[in-house]
Amino acid sequence: MHIVLEFFLVTFRVLWAFVLAAGKWLLRPKDKSVAGQVCLITGAGSGLGRLFALEFARRRAQLVLWDINSQSNEETAEMVRNIYRELEAEDSARRANSSAEEEVLPCCNLKVYTYTCDVGKRESVYSTAERVRREVGDVYLLLNNAGVVSGHHLLECPDELIERTMMVNCHAHFWTTKAFLPKMMELNHGHIVSVASSLGLFSTAGVEDYCASKFGVVGFHESLSHEIKASDKDGIKTTLVCPYLVDTGMFRGCRIRKEIEPFLPPLKPDYCVKQAMRAILTDQPMICTPRLMYIVTCMKSILPFEAVVCMYRFLGADKCMYPFIAQRKQATNNNEAKNGI
């Protein structure tokens, strides 16, 4: 009898979860504040990482930027400083124009910290994380964004590049999370964001290493989310970001069928980041961009494999990475010829 009652209770909770999800979809929750909170972003020197940094800066977060390229990372930091200066000017203007009765925002007094770190190396992650704790303080939001792509067919890809892809795209999430999650657990306060890819939900030919790394991120993130829930740490949130192809140049040359491409073009980086920010600031567990990716993932799960192959061929998705791989190979050959290799 006890298990029967529990079954009905679970059924009610499942249905209630659907109601809450529908309510959040219809009535968007208010964005939470990250003002003054320490937000660490990996791969902040370019692409989505840079755009995430600028978005969090506009929301007055205290930023810690990691990248393997110190020059590009510093360029992002200077953009962040410009935003901070603009915010400080706005605060000063408000104080000057406000009456005594009006509440005035305090001065920003925000700083951005840059660290050169190779997230593909465990020792580099742990040593840099220790510096962050010592020089900045506790990290509230960890955004794992750093990623690489080899751009080779499996049988032509050097083993070292496969290992590098797995280390940077997947293993780094383990190292950074192990470095910063303990304090979040202690305080029951934090947020972990994993930037994966639609290629972590379904795959295509020619990017076996990249797909494996992103599938790994999705599995890691889902298991981590369950572990946090099992620990009853309801103050720690997680968000999984799975965008479709983003027009950052990382997959330049990738093409689906030309008749279909106008309906499913590469995502603009700004749009992708704004959608992800909306999910992060409302504690949404997962965001796929565009929403069509939810349907594709569901269909891939229920359709026979041959049916999926048929759909891929119709969309031109079966060999969509081949032009990208050819361009990367040509660029490599040109570079070797230029350097006399």
Swiss-Prot record:
Sites where the protein binds substrate: 197
Cross-referenced InterPro entries: NAD(P)-bd_dom_sf, Sc_DH/Rdtase_CS, SDR_fam
Protein name: Retinol dehydrogenase 10-A
This enzyme's EC code(s): 1.1.1.300
Gene3D superfamilies: NAD(P)-binding Rossmann-like Domain (3.40.50.720)
Family listed: Belongs to the short-chain dehydrogenases/reductases (SDR) family.
SUPFAM superfamilies: NAD(P)-binding Rossmann-fold domains (SSF51735)
NADP found in the keyword field: yes
PANTHER family: PKSB, RETINOL DEHYDROGENASE 10
Bilayer disposition of the protein: Single-pass membrane protein
Pfam families with a match to the protein in the record: adh_short
Tagged with keyword Membrane: yes
Record-annotated active site: 210 (proton acceptor)
GO cellular component: endoplasmic reticulum membrane; lipid droplet
Species, as recorded: Xenopus laevis
Transmembrane segments: 3-23
Function, as annotated: Retinol dehydrogenase with a clear preference for NADP. Converts all-trans-retinol to all-trans-retinal. Has no detectable activity towards 11-cis-retinol, 9-cis-retinol and 13-cis-retinol.
Molecular function (Gene Ontology), one example: oxidoreductase activity, acting on the CH-OH group of donors, NAD or NADP as acceptor
